[in-house]
Amino acid sequence: MGGASKKPISTVEKRMKKMAEEQQKKQQKRATTKTGKELTSKNVVIDNETLKKVQEELKKETIVTPYTLSTKLNVTISVAKKILEELERQGVVKIGTKDRRTAVYIAAS
């Protein structure tokens, strides 16, 4: 009837080590993003190299959606949407149809 026995010190130390390692792993996961290149900031800077790749893809296809662009450039869909919006402002592409979810862009030629 004496009650539960205390756990040995080695068991407590092992548990503390495990918890510390798990916290380190969680912090490392938070530091990296899905692509590994982009930071977690909301501002997306589109470099000239990416724009050249997009323009080459536009020459191959007549219709482009954010999904098709994101799969070919290996970027997220939100980044692809921003790229297409920027190209529309520049006059490189035109919006064919726009839905509440997707937009279909046509190469302006």
Curated annotation (Swiss-Prot):
Q: What's a Pfam family in this record?
A: Ribosomal_S25
* TM spans (from-to): none
Q: Which family does it belong to?
A: Belongs to the eukaryotic ribosomal protein eS25 family.
Renumbered to this chain, the Basic and acidic residues biased-composition regions fall at 12-25
UniProt cross-references to NCBIfam families, sorted A to Z: PRK09334.1-2, PRK09334.1-4
Which protein is depicted? Small ribosomal subunit protein eS25
**Coiled coil (residue ranges):** none
Give a yes or no for keyword Disulfide bond in this entry.
no
Q: Which PANTHER family match?
A: 40S RIBOSOMAL PROTEIN S25
